Every structure is written in structure tokens, then in C-alpha cells.
Amino acid sequence: MPLFMDVHQSLPTGTKAKDVAGAHAADVKTQDKYGVKYLKYWVDEKAGKVFCLVDAPTAEAAAKVHKEAHGLVADEIYPVSEGS
């Protein structure tokens, strides 16, 4: 399946890494319904940004998981290739 990196540019004020961990857990509970697998995420609390690496059939399928799981949809989703 293709890999995508989604970018959340502006999280709600005061969002912490533990909040993102909870959202990720909700993604994991929802992902099978859409044939998606959220692999990793990175949080920049200071900048209010989150980056999620996802294995998904389409960018739209990845977005549907976020929307259903917690409503925090990404601002941008990029197709990416893994390097060494």
C-alpha cells in the first residue's frame, strides 16, 4: 500500500503529546474499517503541529479515519516513499 504523511498545522491551543497519543489510539481502533494502518506520529507541542505516517490505499481513506476517530483532520496529506 502507498505511504502518506499527513500534517496537522494548527492543533487546538494547549494540546499536549498525551492528547495526540489518545487521538492515535482512536485512529488505531478505527483504521481497519478503512483498510488503513497508522504507523507512527511525531508531535511538536511548541509549534502546535503533528505529523502522522500512514499506510493507506488512498489519502482520502486516511483522512476518513481521522475524521471518524476524533475529528482532527489533517491540513495536508503527502504521498511519501521510505528511504534508508
Segment roles from a protein language model:
Residues D55-S84:
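An amphipathic, aromatic/His-enriched active-site/gating alpha helix that lines ligand/cofactor pockets
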